[in-house]
Amino acid sequence: MTDSTAGFSTRAIHAGQPFEESTGAVIPPLHLSTTYHPYSIGELRGGYDYSRGTNPTRDSLQQQLAALEGGRFGISYASGLGAEDAVLRGLLKPGDHVVMGNDVYGGTFRLISRIHGAVGIGHTPVDLTDVDAVRAAVAETGAKLLWIETPSNPMMRIADVEALVAVAHEAGAYALVDNTFASPYLQQPLALGADLVVHSTTKYLGGHSDVVGGAVITNSEEIDSAVRFIQFAAGNQSSPFDAYLTTRGAKTLAVRMDRHCDNAEAVASWLLGRSEVSHVLYPGLDDHPGHDVAARQMRRFGGMVSVRLKGGEAAARKVAESTRVFTLAESLGGVESLMNYPSEMTHASVKGTELAVPEDLLRLSVGLEDAEDLLSDLERAFEGL
C-alpha cells in the first residue's frame, strides 16, 4: 500500500511489501540473485537484468522509504555518506558551491571539504539558525546547494526548514535536508518544501544497529534521475540483505520513535537537575533556542540529547567511560542506548577547525530500555565525578 492518505505506520508496514504471488508468502522473499533470465534478448522480466542496477528487495525498500517521507522517489545506498556523495556528484559540478551549517556532521564536512573540495566544489559553513546570515552566504557564493541538518549533530540546533527552503529557492539553489536525527516519523522536510531528503538509514530507520545504509528521497524526477544514475554507475547501492534488514526495521519506526522520545524527555529532565551539568541540549526543553521552531515542524522532539559538563573534558570522559546501560560507542538510533564523546569520536575529523565540538560535551542516543534503568545508570556515572 502506497496510498499517501494511509497513516504512517500503515505505510511503513505495507509500502513496497505486497504478498508474494506464487506462494502467497506475506513477507516478500529476499532476492539474492545477481542476475536475471529475460524472456528474450531485450525483453526483461519485471525490468530486472543485473542486480547492481535493479533488485526486487532493494526496490521494496526504496518504495517504503519514499512512502515514509511522502516522496515520489526513493533511492537506497550502501551508507549515509554514500547517499550524500551521490547527491553531490549528481547535482553539482566543479565551480559550484555548498552552503551548510557550521555544526554539520563531521563526516559530511569531510566529504564536502576534502573529497569534493579537491575537484572544485566550494563550501561555506554558516549558522543555519540565522536566516539572514544564510541568505547572505548563499548570495555571496552563488551557492547551488543549501545543506540543512536539523536537529544538528551533536549540538542539537534547530533550523527553520521552511524559511531556509525559501532562501534557497529565491537564489535558484537546491534545498537538501538531512533528516537522520529526526526520522520521517518526526519530521517531513518534503512537505516543508525541501527538494530532497537524505538519511543514514543505519540510524533510526534501520533501528537495530545491525545494518549500514543510506537513502535519498525526492519528488523531483530530475533529481531522482541524476542521483539514481550515480547509484547504478558508481555501484553504491544497498545490498539485498542490507535492504531487507532496513525494510524490516523501518516497519516499527513509529512505535520505536515514540519510546525514544519518551525516554529522551526523561533523561533531559533528569540532567537539568544535576549540579555537574552546565547545559542540556534538547529541543523539547522550553528554554531551548529552537524549541518553538521544533514544535512547529516536528511531531515530537527526538531521541537525541547532548549535555555539557562543568568539569570540562575530564568529567565528560569519565562519565562516558563509567556507564553500564549506556554503551560507549559511535552511531545512534538503535534500540540500545549509546554514549558518545564527539570531540574524539564521531567528530574527530573536524577537531581544530571552525566546526570543532566542545570537549565538555557528551551525546546520548537514548534507547528503548526502561527509563528508570537509564536514569540509575547515569546517576552512578555522575556520582563518580
Predicted regions located by residue number:
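N-terminal "arm"/small-domain region of PLP-dependent enzymes with the aminotransferase-like
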Residues: M1-N55, L61-Q64
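Conserved PLP-enzyme active-site core in the AAT-like
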Residues: T2-S4, F73-E276, L281
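C-terminal core of ALDH-fold dehydrogenases
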Residues: T5, A12-V26, A314-K351
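Conserved N-terminal alpha-helix of the aminotransferase class I/II PLP-enzyme fold
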Residues: T35-D85, G107-R114
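PLP-dependent enzyme catalytic core of the Aspartate aminotransferase-like
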Residues: S113, A136-A139, E321, S337-L385
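A common structural junction motif
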Residues: A234-G235, S322-S331, A381-L385
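Short, well-ordered beta-strand elements within core beta-sheets of diverse protein domains
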Residues: T246-V255, G302-K310, L362-G367
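Conserved small-domain helix->loop->beta segment predominantly found in fold-type I
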Residues: E265-R324, L328-E330, S349-A356
